[in-house]
A protein has these predicted regions:
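Bacterial N-terminal signal peptides that target proteins for export
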Residues: 2-11
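Bacterial N-terminal signal peptides
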Residues: 10-20
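N-proximal helix/coil linker or "cap" segments that precede and/or mark the start of modular domains
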Residues: 20-40
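Structural micro-motif
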Residues: 39, 124-127, 143-150
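A short beta-strand-turn-helix
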Residues: 41-61
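Short active-site neighborhood of thiol/selenol oxidoreductases, capturing the structured segment around
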Residues: 55-74, 186
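Structural microenvironment flanking redox-active thiols in thiol-disulfide oxidoreductases
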Residues: 74-122, 132-140
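Thiol-/selenol-based redox modules, centered on thioredoxin-like
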Residues: 151-212
Length: 212
């Protein structure tokens, strides 16, 4: 059977259209970019309540990815550094959201009960602790290691993303001499000044996503 050129063109166009749709579906969600609006998300906290980023519109927000078995995270909690930051800045009106994005069965995953126990053990006081076992929020913000930090300004734009400081070690003593990027960003925003360092590479333990 002869197939006309017109018929072949229609088939080709249909194939291209299907391919385009498949590719569009396969494209991952956009990740956060410094200076651009922070990607919106919702996640359940450790009480089962759904928390939306938009709930905190107009406020400065810190996103802190954590892992209770990571020595790099342990450095900042065992030294009391992370708790001190949480207390200082939440008292000043900053919203501090701690997140766990490792998949079930992977190192770093926590149940609500385990997350509550971690907060009690560390005497941590974030605004909330969000659970992200499917990794949706972590991928949106390209979180790859713990601790991974993001600062969002009052206009809803990403002001800083990356490491907590400039000293990638597990030594508690290094906290005192390290330059803390999160502190610098928050203080600059509070003073109405531009953030000097807006992006760094996070160091620490890798976040174990479900398909990686």
């Amino acid at each position: 059977m002869r197939v006309s050129t017109k018929t072949m063109s229609v088939v080709a166009l249909a194939a291209i259209s299907i391919l385009a749709v498949d590719q569009a579906i396969a494209v991952p969600p956009p990740t956060a970019r410094v200076g651009e609006p922070a990607p919106q998300f919702n996640a359940q906290d450790i009480t089962g309540k759904t928390i939306r980023l938009g709930d905190y519109a107009g406020k400065t927000i810190v996103l802190e990815w954590t892992n209770d078995g990571c020595p790099f995270v342990g450095k900042h909690y065992d030294s009391g550094n992370m708790q001190a930051l949480q207390q200082k800045y939440t008292a000043a009106g900053v919203v501090w959201l701690t997140l766990a994005s490792s998949a079930p069965g992977e190192q770093g995953y926590v149940t609500p009960a385990e997350a509550k126990a971690d907060l009690a053990h560390w005497r941590a006081t974030p605004t909330d602790f969000l659970l992200d076992p499917n990794g949706i929020v972590g991928r949106l913000y390209d979180a790859r290691a713990t601790p991974n930090m993001v600062v969002i300004d009052r206009t809803g734009r990403v002001a800083y993303m990356g490491a907590i400081d400039d000293t990638p070690s597990t030594r508690l003593a290094d906290v005192k001499t390290a330059h803390n990027y999160v502190t610098a960003a928050l203080d600059a925003l509070a003073a109405g000044q531009p953030v000097a360092v807006t992006s760094t590479r996070a160091y620490g333990c890798s976040i174990k996503y479900s398909d990686e």
